[in-house]
Amino acid sequence: MNMPRCLLHALTALSIASTLSMTGCDSGPRTLTIGVLVAQTGPSGARGKDLLHGASLAAEEINQGGFMVDGRPLKIQIRATDDKGEVEAAALQARDLIDTGIDAMIGPVNSNQAAAVIPIVAAKGLPQLITATSATLLALGQGNVLRLLANDEQQGRAIASFAAETLHSQRIAIVVEKSDYGRGLDASVVAGLAKMHLAAIASAEIDDKSQLPLETIARFRAEKIDTLVFLAREPQLVGLLDSLEKTGWTDLAVVGTNVIRNRSVAHRPLQIRALYATATAIDAKEFPEGKVFLESFRKRYGGDPVWGAQYAYDAVYALADAARQARSLDASDLVETLKRIDPGTKVNQQMRFAATGEQVYPNIGVYKVDHEAWAMQMMSATW
């Protein structure tokens, strides 16, 4: 039976329109949705906002065009939360972000929150990129957790090496936060010192809301401590420095970690011999390509990063490059590709993930307070 010509034309037009419509869908942008789960308020709020700013800046740059995945433009969507540095809030927000349909996660900031969140994200197999440094965190995942910087076991070795070989410390005391963070670092420092035939003369533990008692400081002074390794956070450090000044004990060096290396600490007048901090988060200006990032960051936010914005910035570029090279936004493809490639990061161009998820080149720096600023003293990936 012959089909009427008008009907044939109508069906042909419909077929062409349908084909064009499908082609249009196939050539439209692909969206990579990244959850940024960080503290934006509370004690870690400044660092969390810093990470969010870095991730958002990278997303804006990528979204301005030119980034393709399997022949289609890639768009980055950032979904941010504020866990306020609270473990329960972090776990709840992780579930909420996953329910909204994210493809990857950056954060949380600190190890306590990360320990609660990692199993939740691992159950979905999503790539999770973290700045939290507790050495045990990656084992809580299922191969999906990737650390953006060195871990605390490596940092502990660096502290021991610096104290023994650079400061030539002979009488060391260690102050340890009562947490997985503090105790993990302590174990690494003690092991590192033992390899150099040294041991701490004295030690003390404090929780995250207490200060080192004056009687403990007096005991350390009586032991003629020359170097105090401080494995706790900024509020406890401020209390320690206040107490040292009140007691008139200033002839010692204090060596802390990432968590004390803040502007507020550097701006404080110091009476002690020296204040150092090891850093797994290296300042952007220390990298050859950091200048370009800093110019963009200042233009966008009106000032310099306060901590590690460049790591979240690079994390977004690493995820985007993994999507491009995998030609996929599938979680397992992203994780596998991130561990296989040299991701196209912008600031730390040595960022490379081992099969374990740790960094292949885990740079650790040592900074010293000098003229109200943290000045780099040395940096190495092998301690």
Regions found by a protein language model. Give the residues of each.
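Extracytosolic ligand-binding ectodomains
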Residues: 2-18, 22-383
